[in-house]
Amino acid sequence: MKRAIVTGGAGLIGTGICEALASAGWDVASLDIREGTGAARQVICDVTDESSVAEAFDSLGWDEIDLLVNNAGIAKPYGGPLAEMSLAEWRRVVDSHLTGAFLVTRAAIPRLRAGGSIVNMASTRAVMSEPETEPYAAAKGGLIALTHALAISLGPRIRVNAIAPGWIADGTGLGPRDHAQHPAGRVGMPSDVAEAVSYLASAGFMTGQVLVLDGGMTRKMIYED
């Protein structure tokens, strides 16, 4: 049985990934600061803390894994005006997305089987911008750069790719206008991201790439009335 570790496995996207992989027959472990669903083994872990990551891997006890999904991070992209932001606030966001991915990847590399895969969860905010999202955008942009570098460093034994989701929601509280903004005709769902993870886990000739999963939003020109 193939083994997968998903960080941030208790969140909206992480839960979808864990459930999809478990349904496909994977043995899945969720590393998160809180417990998630029963689809995965639950390992409490703060990915920004070096000792917590080491303890999580020791607790899990897996000597070999096939897939690492670096999905953990503070979901709220808006951080307020940069001129008013404290260093602690900046570090909190960047550490949760980027430093956490470094710490977990470092721990996972010796355990990844040949032919294994790493999938980093980036964001369309790394390639297009909104006001007051600087720490989030910087962290996600860093994840894309980390993906490129790791693909070269770890290949050909390990493949490394990233997914850049756009608007992903559980479907509640959305109206026709929300869906109509997307050329695909709808807002994305966690299952869309999970399908992309499954694809990248099996795509043997794909590495160092960023899969933009946004319903076409980054290709659409939007003009305000």
Give residue spans per PLM region.
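Alpha-helical segment proximal to the catalytic Tyr-Lys
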Residues: 110, 151-156
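C-terminal substrate-recognition "lid" of short-chain dehydrogenase/reductases
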Residues: 111, 186-213, 218
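Canonical Rossmann dinucleotide-binding motif of NAD(H)/NADP(H)-dependent dehydrogenases/reductases
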Residues: 1-27
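Residue(s) in the substrate-gating loop at a strand-loop-helix junction
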Residues: 123
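Substrate-binding pocket helix/loop in short-chain dehydrogenase/reductase
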Residues: 79-82, 86-91, 178
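Active-site helix of classical SDR
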Residues: 105, 139, 147
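Conserved Rossmann-fold SDR core element
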Residues: 144, 154-168, 206-213
